[in-house]
Amino acid sequence: MICLVLTIFAHIFPSAWTGINERTFLAIKPDGYQRRLLGEIIRRFEKKGFRLVAMKIVQASEKLLKQHYIALQDKPFYDRLVKYMGSGPVVAMVWQGLDVVKTARLMIGETNPAHSLPGTIRGDFCIDVGRNVIHGSDSRESAEREIALWFQPDELVYWQDSAESWIYE
């Protein structure tokens, strides 16, 4: 219900999450956590110039995961996906920057690692589609919904990046 209200609110009032304030949700999945890829993944987004505004390590509940993946509930792999995502720690993150949703998806690579180019996270670290290390929002709308699911507003840190003038014109 909360997600529905937030979605309606987001459509009525234009988001402040545009331009260099655009935000996306990323989650390092249990396989990425167990394989100790956190530092490498975070490093890539920091080096790109994006700003980390929230991060936490959680053992996601089945309820949260079912809400998160609700659009996939009719897919044959849905139950396996929810079980897998609940099998270990997940690192939930919010990143901010210009075109961060689109750029993060490019940096992550295709859902199926076999179709991901070298240099992408999945191209470099994944083999199997069922263990593809990281989730990234696929649109601004998804990002807003997913951020609201995983984080309370007071968990997002607003800070001035001293390098911003060296990243953006």
From Swiss-Prot:
GO terms for molecular function: nucleoside diphosphate kinase activity. Its EC number is 2.7.4.6. ADP binds at K29, R105, T111, R122, V129, N132. The keyword Transferase applies. It catalyses: a 2'-deoxyribonucleoside 5'-diphosphate + ATP = a 2'-deoxyribonucleoside 5'-triphosphate + ADP; a ribonucleoside 5'-diphosphate + ATP = a ribonucleoside 5'-triphosphate + ADP. Homohexamer. Catalyzes the phosphorylation of ribonucleosides and deoxyribonucleoside diphosphates, other than ATP, into the corresponding triphosphates with ATP as the major phosphate donor. The ATP gamma phosphate is transferred to the nucleoside diphosphate beta phosphate via a ping-pong mechanism, using a phosphorylated active-site intermediate. Through the catalyzed exchange of gamma-phosphate between di- and triphosphonucleosides participates in regulation of intracellular nucleotide homeostasis. Required for ciliary function during renal development. This is Nucleoside diphosphate kinase 3-B. The gene is nme3.L.
